[in-house]
Amino acid sequence: MSWQTYVDDHLMCDIEGHEGHRLTAAAIVGHDGSVWAQSATFPQFKPEEMNGIMTDFNEPGHLAPTGLHLGGTKYMVIQGEAGAVIRGKKGSGGITIKKTGQALVFGIYEEPVTPGQCNMVVERLGDYLLEQGL
């Protein structure tokens, strides 16, 4: 299965039980910042934004004072799982990032998708990739 298929079929899919509700953008990005696959709507990010995200996984709390930036959009960092998941909020939407052994799985959402639904979609794929040694 190609990385693009993971994004299209496992991240940008309808959310279980909520036909027509889906993430607004998603991607799988290597730890080095290289894009493995992304939705057409995923923002163009700057290398320093990805560096900040990777630093926060290695030093939890790093982004809390400044916020998480992706594609020029600032998200307020909310509770995550140290070293494993970063979550951010902006207005009625937000972002979930799950770290695997080799990649970061990104999901960006807006209402009517809820933070919990985004977390479920992103973390389910991230956990699967971890189980596969990726």
UniProtKB/Swiss-Prot annotation:
Highest taxon listed in the record's lineage: Eukaryota
Lineage: Eukaryota, Viridiplantae, Streptophyta, Embryophyta, Tracheophyta
Cross-referenced Pfam families: Profilin
Stated family: Belongs to the profilin family.
Subcellular location(s) of the protein: Cytoplasm, Cytoskeleton
SUPFAM superfamilies, per the entry: Profilin (actin-binding protein)
InterPro entries: PFN (IPR048278), PFN_euk (IPR005455), PFN_sf (IPR036140), Profilin_CS (IPR027310)
Gene Ontology CC, one term: cell cortex
Remaining remarks: The variability of the residues taking part of IgE-binding epitopes might be responsible of the difference in cross-reactivity among olive pollen cultivars, and between distantly related pollen species, leading to a variable range of allergy reactions among atopic patients.
Entry-linked SMART domains: PROF (SM00392)
GO MF term list: actin monomer binding
Role this protein plays: Binds to actin and affects the structure of the cytoskeleton. At high concentrations, profilin prevents the polymerization of actin, whereas it enhances it at low concentrations.
Record note on modification: Phosphorylated by MAP kinases.
Positions bearing Phosphothreonine: 114
Keyword Disulfide bond found: yes
Keywords annotated in UniProt: Actin-binding, Allergen, Cytoplasm, Cytoskeleton, Disulfide bond, Phosphoprotein
Name used for this protein in its record: Profilin-3
Positions occupied by motif Involved in PIP2 interaction: 84-100
Quaternary structure (record): Occurs in many kinds of cells as a complex with monomeric actin in a 1:1 ratio.
Disulfide bonds: 13-118
Cytoplasm found in the keyword field: yes
